[in-house]
């Protein structure tokens, strides 16, 4: 299997399966001298960790990360950083009934056809369990970017099913009005406090029905420097979409206004420039594939997981029709735990592009002052 490495100068290679002994990652290209401890990584891992509320999977993993290499006396050395997380709460017996059948909506059929075999225990390599290593690696990138630029990367769930987040006093949702501390204080990472109770009732009903529901996640990077992105084929927004689309269950990504631009006229959509700053940010902080210095804003659509307790039709390994019910412990809404994963993938993309920009354009000087974001 190829395709396990993300990035060009700041690279992350992950390995491991859902029900294997553990998960791991190698991060190469991290500059030396960054103060780094396991506690720095654990903060985001705990936000993603399963079994933390009634609205996520009941699988309980400590997800305690170990730094194996690349850090000496509390600082990165510039050599590859090795990370490891042990799996401790596998329950492979839950998947015995699907060993010979394909779960509809999952990677079972495509993995089987591509590789001629598959790890049916929780999906093996195709499981979202793999994303724990992305979150750990992303925490390194977030820390470096925060110290270098004061950059913050934050995400929240802005829609679950037909429940959509609003701004203050019912105004349309706006990332600039989000109280990020309140986002961390509710189990849904939801920015609209007026709908938390409604969300709880809604998801409890979904769980009773043994079903699942989709979600929308919004991720925002602030204090991004101008100039990140490598046109033509490595445009910043293209690589952001690549990183976010690689997250399990993501079926759509928008940058800035995304598909809403279809209804906009050019006179509305263009982000006019003034000496005081940009008038709007319909572009989501990227112009011509290069960061403009404005907030980078992206939205992710996550499908409802197909691992549900509702009987569905499928075929077995010999192509015969059969019915299937997926047992095991699964998230009723995978979008909730996708919040730190989205932050991680945006951080990894921006970190990689910063190093690429510095490598080629460090000596470029421009007399035009940066426009305020």
Curated annotation (Swiss-Prot):
Domain of life: Bacteria
Protein's UniProt keywords contain NADP: yes
Listed GO biological process terms: amino acid biosynthetic process; aromatic amino acid family biosynthetic process; chorismate biosynthetic process
Pathway annotation: Metabolic intermediate biosynthesis; chorismate biosynthesis; chorismate from D-erythrose 4-phosphate and phosphoenolpyruvate: step 7/7
Keyword Flavoprotein tagged: yes
InterPro entries attached to this UniProt entry: Chorismate_synth, Chorismate_synth_AroC_sf, Chorismate_synthase_CS
NCBIfam families for the chain: aroC, PRK05382.1
Name under which the protein is recorded: Chorismate synthase
Organism, as annotated: Colwellia psychrerythraea (strain 34H / ATCC BAA-681) (Vibrio psychroerythus)
Lineage: Bacteria, Pseudomonadati, Pseudomonadota, Gammaproteobacteria, Alteromonadales
Gene name of the record: aroC
């Amino acid at each position: 299997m190829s395709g396990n490495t993300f990035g060009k100068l700041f690279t992350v290679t992950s390995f491991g399966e859902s029900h294997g002994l553990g998960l791991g990652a190698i991060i190469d290209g991290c500059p030396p001298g960054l103060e780094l401890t396991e506690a720095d990584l654990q903060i985001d891992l705990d936000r993603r960790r399963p079994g933390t509320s009634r609205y996520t999977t009941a699988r309980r993993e400590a997800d305690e990360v170990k730094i194996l290499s690349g850090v000496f006396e509390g600082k990165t050395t510039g050599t590859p950083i090795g990370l490891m997380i042990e799996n401790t709460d596998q329950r492979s017996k839950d998947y015995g009934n699907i060993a010979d059948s394909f779960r509809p909506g999952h990677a079972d059929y495509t993995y089987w056809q591509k590789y001629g075999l598959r790890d049916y225990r929780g999906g093996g390599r195709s499981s979202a369990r793999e994303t724990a290593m992305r979150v750990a690696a992303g925490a390194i990138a977030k820390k470096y970017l925060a110290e270098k630029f004061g950059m913050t990367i934050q995400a929240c769930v802005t829609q679950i099913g037909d429940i959509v987040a609003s701004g203050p006093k019912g105004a349309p949702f706006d990332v600039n009005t989000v109280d990020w501390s309140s986002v961390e204080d509710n189990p849904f990472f939801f920015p609209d406090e007026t709908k938390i109770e409604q969300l709880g009732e809604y998801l409890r009903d979904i769980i009773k029905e043994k079903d699942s529901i989709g979600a929308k996640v919004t991720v925002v990077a602030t204090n991004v420097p101008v100039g990140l992105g490598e046109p033509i084929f490595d445009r910043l927004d293209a690589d952001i979409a690549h990183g976010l689309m690689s997250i399990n269950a993501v079926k759509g990504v928008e940058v800035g206004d995304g598909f809403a631009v279809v209804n906009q006229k050019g006179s509305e959509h263009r982000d006019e420039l003034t000496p005081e700053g940009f008038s709007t940010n319909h572009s989501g902080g990227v112009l011509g594939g290069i960061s403009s210095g404005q907030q980078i804003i992206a939205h992710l659509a996550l499908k409802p997981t197909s691992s549900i307790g509702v009987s569905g039709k499928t075929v077995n390994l010999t192509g015969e029709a059969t019915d299937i019910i997926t047992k095991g412990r699964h998230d009723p809404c995978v979008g909730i735990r996708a919040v730190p994963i989205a932050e991680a993938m945006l951080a990894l993309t921006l970190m990689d592009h910063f190093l690429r920009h510095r490598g080629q354009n460090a000596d470029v000087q421009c007399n035009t002052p940066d426009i305020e974001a």
